[in-house]
Amino acid sequence: AASDVYKRQRVQGNLPAMEYYRRKCDFIPAVMEAYESLSREYDVIVIEGAGSPAEINLQENDIVNMGLARMVDAPVLLVGDIDRGGVFAQLYGTVALQSEEDKKRIKGVVVNKFRGDRAILEPGLKMLEQLCGVPVAGVVPYLSVDIDDEDSLSERFGRGREPRLIDIAVIRLPRISNFTDFSPFEHYANVSLRYVERVRDLRAPDMIVLPGTKSTIADLGWLRQSGLEAAIKKAASGGTLVFGVCGGYQMLGRHISDPEQVEAACVTEIDGMGLLPGETVFEGAKVQTQTSGVFSGVEGLLSVLNGKRYAGYEIHMGRSEARGALISAGNVYGSYVHGIFDEQEVTDTILKALCEKRGVSFKALGNFDWKAYKERQYDLLADAVRAGLDMKLIYRILEREV
């Protein structure tokens, strides 16, 4: 196992587990600098832990759970997932395995993803409070809300298998990232969004998408070995719209080089797919920026995007020769901008172009406002969390009264 480590936006390397644990204390000054910068700007900072604070083999020099809470003197809420089962053992065991100092830092426990009548849970909650000596700060129900998943935890990859009026195939790269870029397409009534990892499943989609990846060179190698690269190039030559985002865009170019081994791959250079102009060179500094503007210079089927506004963000290693919000060559397109499909006008315009090419009515796809939908989902989540938590206790914890 290894971890990609970044400090102040610069790559520190792909560190094997033992080397990371040996060096992690070196990163504390950067962690504290980031925290202090945030504390000057915000009244409340929420720190999400990583993994479990009960992993006692990792507690020495910890910088992501209780260790960080100690460094910044933060009170702690311990959250357990009851949907996976064994939540009382999780919460009690986690508290029991803490040092006496860290036990005092835990100000409340929360049961998350509860299904059913809370009254059934009450006897267990009372026993948990007695055993842990920590109040139960709330029970949050299991919610059917549609919010973004973590790349490694998504259950969406199996959805939308049956082609509909417009069929979009996203290549499921082994190290796929930012796949939620394409979520807006899922909500049109007659659009199917499929994740494909085998040539036989590609079929004949209206649009092929190459998504972002945590390792462009390695995933391009996989794409080549799997036969999907050849299948995509054949589809592109037949007129299928191909769209690459971030790492997917880099793959579509002529060449990729990594002289500093930023991606820590055995291969430091590789020929791209050659469907877009330009080359990409990886370098130590990571691009992280928000971006917005108006499309211009777009050619081919998606030339109808010219004059339309876009907004999103870039987060990537490597710089490409060809720059601009959207690079095009025939029916092949590439962009570094994540969130480019969140703008309804952009998504509608692309789907209209696909419908026109196919000779079907755009109205048959249905109408969908992605931004309004996302706001409703987060409002539902916020309302349920607020209703499930003892907010008086939460505010007392924030005010250091507990």
Residue ranges and their predicted role:
Residues 1-236, 241, 258-261, 284, ...:
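Flexible phosphate-sensing "switch/lid" loops adjacent to ATP/NTP-binding sites
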Residues 246:
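Catalytic nucleophile serine of serine hydrolases
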Residues 253-308:
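A conserved active-site-flanking secondary-structure segment within enzyme catalytic domains
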